[in-house]
Amino acid sequence: MNMGSLGLYITFLGLLAAIYQLRQNFLQQRTIFEDSISKEYRDIIQRIPYRALIGEEILLSEASAVQNEVYNYMDLCNEQIYLRMSNRVSKKTWNNWQEGMKTNFELKVFNDTLNEVFEKLPSNFIELQSVKALNFSTDPKKCKIYDNLLKWILN
């Protein structure tokens, strides 16, 4: 092997190492970003009474505050869906978030608020409406057509 070939080989190995480092940096930054979104979820859920989180009736005095937090959660869900559509979160993270959406929206106060908002604001939360229509079992990154279809149906 001559010096020119050796130099090319070393350059190639250096390029591979740089690509690997860039990929690792990207994955680390994505994880930090995903964790920040998960913190938003925890902040919202902390403000919802325990009774609501286990599916029990809430006190009338709590209803308005709980509905506000569920609305905030719906907004967060819509953002999470958009982030997956834009490939800003991993499939693993998306699947975890989607499973959480399904579980939370099965709870009475979440489901009641969701249905009320969808009824009163049919053109809002289009992404969330689409994912719910598919029973929280989809990957928005793969298929954006349902979003356009739902917009067409609602108009």
Located regions from the model:
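An amphipathic alpha-helical interaction surface
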Residues: 62-155
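Membrane-proximal alpha-helical anchors
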Residues: 1-67
